[in-house]
């Protein structure tokens, strides 16, 4: 092949202010569009000035975007436009703005890019394997195996290999390639996002600035990913106005106000992208209704344009847009690139020729290698000359990427064996071409021009001029820190108000829980019997407000991706975001705390004193703020939510235990006592205890004071105890202390003696509480500035250990292509389709909307036969998916009428099982491999008479046929985590899961939705293979290319309202279809036109929607084609033309499920157990929590002795063990909800019934929970010195494990009942309040209000505590320590025992020191202690049985709720 090129200079149209006068190579070939040009003919060069003029004129004439309300500050002399004049064209606006800016001293930032020898190295597939619970042990074992040391780092591969290209300012570069070609990586590297790769070598310069120095200009080269990441509760206006506030430049036009400038730009951009009408619509997401997917994509693009970056990289930014919107978007960035000298690099999904021709150059990648870089006008001819052929009506971008696909490319006669086959072949051909040398010369000249003109000098100067004058000289931010904070405060307020329903729900939940708290401690006694309760009530108030703030942890991770994106756009400093959040927290927290405090303070019966009330309010306010900041700090310092939750659980346990309530400060062991001094709970607790107890006296009557009654003097006379030697039975009591004839304990003495708190420290503790808040705020600011936990790399696959495929060399690549061809040729023998015919007639579907019937399908009929591929098309809202749902029996709401017949017979209960339904969303369990998912489908959906070996062999055949053999042992994973298979591979897997079931018919809903052109082609071609193998199928498809449309045999076209427009054959080159419309009054369809777009346009549903003057449904009703359809339907329904095979008859009567309930349960359990086994973060998370909780609790209550205070400590030891169970309630909920979503999808296809799932998911948790409980038991039980004898210890152990089972199953009950996590989080807090507060420890049974006593009797925590506490304290004799004694003077010459004997007996009086002072010990045994709680040792076996009843009841509830919610609402 000989390629002759020359350089010609292109001149822009007269008057166009664009930088298009670049040296661009063009072919000198008048027949450059001729697909049959011989490879020996030398291409010549076309002068493309006419082509450019045509594009420029089209942009000028077709631009429908207008700028209204022209600001008076614009230079009217130049624009000749009045103030309120409209119809101001987009290009004219930009050109006018640019002229005015130049007159004002502003110059465009002309920053192109130049890349030489760029190689990006990524991690190979073997560098990470599928992790499971054995992974840590394997890792440790490998440390002692020298043979594994070298391999530990894993292999690497080149994501990009030796890429050299450039792009001038004001030019647009299109990057094309198949999935995995490296397009996204190239765009990321150009945007200077390199952290996720092993290494990046080569030179990348930005207007002469190298990549290291370019880091100082964050926001000047941005990467816009294909995902749309926005705050869902903001409107379009709020989202863009915020971006504009952060990016409003300083050097605006003279006297131009910021607000005017922002409004002008906003109106321009929303008009440009057609989202003006959606300005006040919420952005929304999958849970919040808002913008459509296409509208959200346009918002993403608009936000990127607001950033005003010099270099912008758009990665598949047209995904989800229709053809018209994509073209408008491309035109807009073309104009902006021309007029504002912006450098644009973009990769597109399914780019049309119209979009393609807007770009200057195109770079084509294949497996990381650059196989073409040059002008768009030369690309097609280049590959034609290499020996490839382009099909008629195939777009140029599809052709360019198609040549890299062995299944798609077509080699012209005479080039067999000569045309490139592998990626390296293509790269060699490119580097040996003359055009490659021309482009190298162009790049060299561009670099010399950069060196001569030094655009970086002007670039740096313009950045300084644009930035706020209050910013530091080297600041990368446009606006000042104060402006950023102010904008963020406004945005945070809008986010909260946008989701005001959640805010109101939160306050309602708080009010309800507050009344529960307050009613439990209602009107507490002010005597000594209420001392402990009063302290508990105050501590509960602190805990409640702290844990209400725990939701901030999840919100921190939710907003992380948005922060990363906007920070990469240099909109604001991350620390400014936190300052703004803190400021918006203050009023919201004040409302929350005020509501809580007003209710609680007065219902508690705390001192009615204004000063004390406001100190209470102020302290709770500071404590809540500090905990909000603490939870955020934990999130900002953690790489993932799982990590932060595990750390949080440890902290919560520490904070609760070492707050000074459950363990007094003087009882804390030295190894953990230090935490008391850094505990955010301890300081507000000390402050509030001092506030309440500091000047309050707690009385006791004569009967309660000790000693009371009489004693026998040494002379034998009976004497009364003297008041000056009596006191209240409480810590801090002073003998003889009385007021108004009653003994009392001063509150200040009590908190000093019992808790070691000083009432004088109240003010200091309040101040420290707020200092904690400030400390955590600073930590958050530092963390946000220093850490970026978001991953920016490409998703990667992980395989089973030792199963990762090798990186193919050229020979292996050729062999793999040959294997695919061989598998394809054998497809018909592999599939062995049952020939079935499915018909539907007079289908109507009605739903209720606002009390009225809404008809969504109106008299639809049709059929699918073996070997036929039927397309289902129509405008948006025509009912395509609705019809498929009805035909596949997936509708659970509404009313369906009409007849659906399979082989001329009514549908049986096995219809869903024998029918394959490929839904639009690819829902797969991420914890399985591809092969495991396919085998699971085959085992449960194929007939039980088929052997397991045959099922597995069939799976392998389908894997090979789907070209996924190398992915069999790859983890499915998820796109969100960046680990797993690609989008296209997921779509293939979705189809494969239906195929291995050997379905009779196949329904496919939008199988190409969201895929690039090559993936779409591969999917449709694969579906065609299924049809050729005898599979009857129907497939909805949205605006297919002309090439894809040719694969279909028949089409069912629907209009809005679910009415039939046409049903029949498409015909060769779509002649049958187009002739129907032409004959009924529509213009002729040209040879070059896409028939799919033609028919949609004809019925007013094309990419440019219009109003058709023809009533097409009525035309269809009067057409002879309808009569033919009805006649054929009648024939099919009466004749049953396709007979049921003898194999089917042998299977017996129809069954809803192919296998027995026991087999289903076993298989579902095995799958769930495998998923749990691989979920290291979940399982090791619960193990870690168990070990950490056990060690913390065990060493906190280290080696408890037999004093009376340690009796209380033993109870609190067991009470804190409950924390692990409560924790597992939280942990079980998200795991259950995730698996429940997969169950609903499986149940719809009749994999298995609801009962196997419910039973299996309960059982699968139990072994892991039992191990966790065992770990906690061994870490805590003997450490605390609780052991007494084997019988009691064993009872403790088995009861504890059973209690954990109850907690996990209780979490599953909540999950089975709830539809989502948000509802579960609303229910949980109230549930946990009931479990914790009404268990009989914090508030004894006698002190619980009568209204709430039913909760105590229905609380599993009560039965666990009663059984375990009585076992632990049984036969324990109390030996009071000196600190536990209530001491009295002995005014007699009697011994202490003699002095107390008449009233208390010998065992109750303990002498300490000499006989002049006696000590009184409250309890003589553990049994006496637990009887004060109303518990009995005799109830322990009963309690154990009741706990089993709770567990069984929970299982029944799980099964019941799963049954009731087994079908999604659709």
UniProtKB/Swiss-Prot annotation:
Residues 23-47 are annotated as: Disordered. The gene is abcG10. This is ABC transporter G family member 10. Belongs to the ABC transporter superfamily. ABCG family. PDR (TC 3.A.1.205) subfamily. Signal peptide: none annotated. The lineage of its organism: Eukaryota, Amoebozoa, Evosea, Eumycetozoa, Dictyostelia. The keyword Transport applies. It is a multi-pass membrane protein. Residues 23-45 have a biased composition (Low complexity).
């Amino acid at each position: 092949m000989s390629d002759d090129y020359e350089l010609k200079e292109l001149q822009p149209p007269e008057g166009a202010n664009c930088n298009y006068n670049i040296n661009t190579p063009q072919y000198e070939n008048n027949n450059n569009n001729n697909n049959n040009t011989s490879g020996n003919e030398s291409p010549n060069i076309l002068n493309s000035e006419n082509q450019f003029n045509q594009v420029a004129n089209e942009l000028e004439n077709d631009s429908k975007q207008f700028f209204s309300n022209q600001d008076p500050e614009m230079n009217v002399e130049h624009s000749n436009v009045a103030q309120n004049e409209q119809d101001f064209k987009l290009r004219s606006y930009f050109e006018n703005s640019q002229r005015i800016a130049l007159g004002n001293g502003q110059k465009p930032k002309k920053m192109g890019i130049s890349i030489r020898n760029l190689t990006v190295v990524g991690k190979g597939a073997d560098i990470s394997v599928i992790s499971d619970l054995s992974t840590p042990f394997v890792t440790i074992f490998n440390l002692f195996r020298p043979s594994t040391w070298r391999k530990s780092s894993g292999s690497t591969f080149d994501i990009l290999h030796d890429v050299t290209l450039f792009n001038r300012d004001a030019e647009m570069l299109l990057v094309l390639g198949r999935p995995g070609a490296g397009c996204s990586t190239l765009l990321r590297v150009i945007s200077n996002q390199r952290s996720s790769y092993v290494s990046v070598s080569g030179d990348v310069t930005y207007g002469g600035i190298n990549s290291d120095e370019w880091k100082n200009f964050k926001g000047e080269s941005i990467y816009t990913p294909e995902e749309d990441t926005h705050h869902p509760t903001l409107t379009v206006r709020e989202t863009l106005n915020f971006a504009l506030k952060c990016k409003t430049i300083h050097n605006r036009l003279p006297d131009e106000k910021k607000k005017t400038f922002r409004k002008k730009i906003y109106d321009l951009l929303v008009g440009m992208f057609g989202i003006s009408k959606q300005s006040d619509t919420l952005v929304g997401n999958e849970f919040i209704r808002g913008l459509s997917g296409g509208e959200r994509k346009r918002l993403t693009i608009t936000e990127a344009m607001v950033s005003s970056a010099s270099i912008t990289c758009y990665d598949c930014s047209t995904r989800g847009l229709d053809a018209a919107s994509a073209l408008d978007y491309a035109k807009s960035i073309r104009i902006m690139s021309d007029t504002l000298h912006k450098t644009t690099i973009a990769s597109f999904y399914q780019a049309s020729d119209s979009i393609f021709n807007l770009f200057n150059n195109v770079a084509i990648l294949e497996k990381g290698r650059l196989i073409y870089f040059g002008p768009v006008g030369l690309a097609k001819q280049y590959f034609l000359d290499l020996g490839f052929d382009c099909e008629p009506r195939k777009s140029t971008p599809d052709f360019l990427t198609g040549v890299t696909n062995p299944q798609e490319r077509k080699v012209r006669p005479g080039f067999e064996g000569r045309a490139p086959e592998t990626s390296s072949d293509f790269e060699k051909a490119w580097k040996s071409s003359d055009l490659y040398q021309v482009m190298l010369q162009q790049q060299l000249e561009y670099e010399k021009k950069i060196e001569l003109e030094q655009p970086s000098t002007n670039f740096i100067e313009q950045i300084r001029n644009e930035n706020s004058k209050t910013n530091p000289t080297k600041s990368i931010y446009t606006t000042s820190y104060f402006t950023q904070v102010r904008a963020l405060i406004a945005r945070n307020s809008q986010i909260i108000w946008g989701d005001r329903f959640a805010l109101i729900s939160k306050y309602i939940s708080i009010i309800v829980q507050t009344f529960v708290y307050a009613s439990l401690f209602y009107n507490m006694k002010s005597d000594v019997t209420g001392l402990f309760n009063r302290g508990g009530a105050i501590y509960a108030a602190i805990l409640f407000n702290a844990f209400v703030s725990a939701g901030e942890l999840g919100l921190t991770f939710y907003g992380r991706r948005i922060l990363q994106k906007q920070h990469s756009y240099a909109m604001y400093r991350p620390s400014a975001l936190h300052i703004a959040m803190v400021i918006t927290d203050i009023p919201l927290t004040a409302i929350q705390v005020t509501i809580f405090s007003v209710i609680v303070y007065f219902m508690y019966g705390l001192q009615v004193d204004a000063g004390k009330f406001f100190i209470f309010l102020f302290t709770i306010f500071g404590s809540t703020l500090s905990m909000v900041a603490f939870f955020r700090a934990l999130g900002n310092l953690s790489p993932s939510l799982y990590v932060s939750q595990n750390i949080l659980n440890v902290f919560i346990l520490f904070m609760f235990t070492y707050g000074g309530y459950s363990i007094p400060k003087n009882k804390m062991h030295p190894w953990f006592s230090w935490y008391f001094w850094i505990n955010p709970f301890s300081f507000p607790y000390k402050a509030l205890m001092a506030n309440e107890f500091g000047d309050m006296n707690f009385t006791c009557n004569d009967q309660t004071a000790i000693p009371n009654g009489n004693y026998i003097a040494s002379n034998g006379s009976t004497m009364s105890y003297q008041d000056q030697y009596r006191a209240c039975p409480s810590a801090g009591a002073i003998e003889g202390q009385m007021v108004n004839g009653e003994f009392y304990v001063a509150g200040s003495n009590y908190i000093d003696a019992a808790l070691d708190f000083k009432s004088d420290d109240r003010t200091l503790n309040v101040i420290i509480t707020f200092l904690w808040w400030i400390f955590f705020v600073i930590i958050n600011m530092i963390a946000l500035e220093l850490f970026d936990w978001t991953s920016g790399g490409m998703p990667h696959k992980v395989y089973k250990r030792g199963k990762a495929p090798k990186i193919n060399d050229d020979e292996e690549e050729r062999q793999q292509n040959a294997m695919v061809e061989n598998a394809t040729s054998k497809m018909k023998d592999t599939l062995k389709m049952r020939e079935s015919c499915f018909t539907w007639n007079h289908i109507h579907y009605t739903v209720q909307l606002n009390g009225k019937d809404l008809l969504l399908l109106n008299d639809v009929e049709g059929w699918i036969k073996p070997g036929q591929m039927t397309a289902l098309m129509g405008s948006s809202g025509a009912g395509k998916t609705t019809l498929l749902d009805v035909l596949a029996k997936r509708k659970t709401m509404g009313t369906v009428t009409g007849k659906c017949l399979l082989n001329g017979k009514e549908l049986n209960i096995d219809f869903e099982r024998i029918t394959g339904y490929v839904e639009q969303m690819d829902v797969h369990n991420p914890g399985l491999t591809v092969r495991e998912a396919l085998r699971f489908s085959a085992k449960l959906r194929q007939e039980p008479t088929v052997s397991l070996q045959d099922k597995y062999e069939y799976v392998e055949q389908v894997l090979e046929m789907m070209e996924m053999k190398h992915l069999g042992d790859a983890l499915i994973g998820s796109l969100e985590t960046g680990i797993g298979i690609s989008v296209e591979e997921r779509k293939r897997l979705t189809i494969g899961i239906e195929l291995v079931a050997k379905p009779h018919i196949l329904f496919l809903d939008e199988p190409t939705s969201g895929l690039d052109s090559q993936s779409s082609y591969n999917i449709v071609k694969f579906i065609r293979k299924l049809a050729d193998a005898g599979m009857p199928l129907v497939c909805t498809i949205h605006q297919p290319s002309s090439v894809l449309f040719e694969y279909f045999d028949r089409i069912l076209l629907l209009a809005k309202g679910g009415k039939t427009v046409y049903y029949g054959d498409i015909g060769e080159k779509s002649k049958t279809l187009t002739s129907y419309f032409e004959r009924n009054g529509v213009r002729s369809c040209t040879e070059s036109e896409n028939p799919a777009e033609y028919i949609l346009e004809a019925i007013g549903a094309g990419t440019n929607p219009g109003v058709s003057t023809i009533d097409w449904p009525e035309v269809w009703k009067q057409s002879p084609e309808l009569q033919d359809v009805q006649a054929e339907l009648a024939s099919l329904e009466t004749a049953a033309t396709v007979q049921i095979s003898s194999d089917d008859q042998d299977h017996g009567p129809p069954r809803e499920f192919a296998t027995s309930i026991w087999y289903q349960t076993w298989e579902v359990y095995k799958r769930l157990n495998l998923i749990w086994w691989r979920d290291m973060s979940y399982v090791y998370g619960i193990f870690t929590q168990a070990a950490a909780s056990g060690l913390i609790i065990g060493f906190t209550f280290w080696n408890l002795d037999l004093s009376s205070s340690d009796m209380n400590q033993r109870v609190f030891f067991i009470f804190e063990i409950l924390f692990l169970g409560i924790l597992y309630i939280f942990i079980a909920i998200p795991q259950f909800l995730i698996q429940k979503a997969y169950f609903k999808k499986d149940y719809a296809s009749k994999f298995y019934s609801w009962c196997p799932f419910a039973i299996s998911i309960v059982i699968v948790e139990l072994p892991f929970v039992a191990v966790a409980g065992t770990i906690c038991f061994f870490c805590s039980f003997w450490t605390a010195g609780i052991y007494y004898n084997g019988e009691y210890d064993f009872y403790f152990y088995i009861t504890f494990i059973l209690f954990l089972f109850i907690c996990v199953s209780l979490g599953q009950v909540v999950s089975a009942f709830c539809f989502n996590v948000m509802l579960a989080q609303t229910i949980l807090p109230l549930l946990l309040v009931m479990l914790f507060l009404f268990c009989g420890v914090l508030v004894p049974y006698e002190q619980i209000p009568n209204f709430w006593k039913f909760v105590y009797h229905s609380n599993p925590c009560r039965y666990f505590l009663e059984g375990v506490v009585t076992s632990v304290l049984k036969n324990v004799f109390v030996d009071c320590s000196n600190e536990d004694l209530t001491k009295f003077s002995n005014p007699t010459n009697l011994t202490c025992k003699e002095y107390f004997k008449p009233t208390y007996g010998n065992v109750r009086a303990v002498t300490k020191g000499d006989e002049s002072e006696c000590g009184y010990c409250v309890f003589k045994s553990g049994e006496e202690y637990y009887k004060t709680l109303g518990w009995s040792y005799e109830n322990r076996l009963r309690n154990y049985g009741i706990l089993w009843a709770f567990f069984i009841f929970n299982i029944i509830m799980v099964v019941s709720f799963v049954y009731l919610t087994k079908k999604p609402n659709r």
